Amino acid sequence: MKAEYADYLRTEMLPTIWCAGCPNGIVLASFIRAVKRGFERDKTVVVSGIGCSGRITQYLDFETVHTTHGRALAFATGIKLAKPELNVVVFMGDGDAVAIGGNHFIHACRRNIDLTAVVINNSLYGMTGGQLAPTTPEGAKTKTSPYGNVERPFDIAKLAIAAGASYVARFTAYQPRWIEKAIFEAMQHHGFSVVEVVTGCPTHQRIKPADLLKHLKENFRRRDNVSLDEIQPTDIGVFKKEVMEEFCEKIEKLRMYVRKGENKENV
């Protein structure tokens, strides 16, 4: 293992539990490189939920919190409000983020709280056996849709934009350097940032890892700054980067206003 990664990992916890060829390692390495580009580890907190992606906090040698299913953003919100000077990064799977955690996701977007959400989207529930998820493509066969999925899937990037996130990007596991840059930009951005990483599951989707990466390379195209109505499921890029008032700042302004009023009453 390269020293540039080992210094940021709990090496005693390795090897990971991830299946051979799982793209989660690509995302993990991209995050480490993003942090090395300009952030202090001691001022960065990493939060995760439940699922294959949730194990990322087990391997990172940061201050980490491994939370309950769908509630990673709720925990992260509390951390950020208590310690707004910290960089808070949240790793979630697609099921964790937009199924059981869907309400937390859209309200974090709406509030525009200064968090970075990295959503690893493999289009199914991997840890529990390959079941149907809200992101499973229409027609896809899973353990719980053996004849094909009849539901329309969520487009996570479009959902984030529509709900109010101020930075939204999407890339695939085939573009680790683009993932790195997007996470770096998201951590720099002052507001709620969503970086969706489209991956896949070699085990449950029964695809060779090399073929999965080839699929991601050949079927996705980069289109930056595309309007919400024009974004397609196979588009990747930075779709939104907008300066908006941040939630913690609004809370602090309110707190100061209330304290000022209380002081007047006590005169």
Swiss-Prot record:
The highest taxon in the source lineage is Archaea
Any one GO biological process? sulfur compound biosynthetic process
Annotated Gene Ontology MF terms? 2-oxoglutarate synthase activity; thiamine pyrophosphate binding
E.C. code: 1.2.7.3
A Pfam family reported for this protein in Swiss-Prot or TrEMBL: TPP_enzyme_C
Q: What reaction does this catalyse?
A: 2 oxidized [2Fe-2S]-[ferredoxin] + 2-oxoglutarate + CoA = succinyl-CoA + 2 reduced [2Fe-2S]-[ferredoxin] + CO2 + H(+)
Query: Which principal EC class is assigned to this enzyme?
Result: oxidoreductase
Keywords of the record, alphabetical order, are: Oxidoreductase
Q: How does it assemble?
A: Heterotetramer of the KorA, KorB, KorC and KorD subunits.
- The entry's protein name is 2-oxoglutarate synthase subunit KorB
Which species expresses this protein natively?
Answer: Archaeoglobus fulgidus (strain ATCC 49558 / DSM 4304 / JCM 9628 / NBRC 100126 / VC-16)
Name the gene for this chain: korB
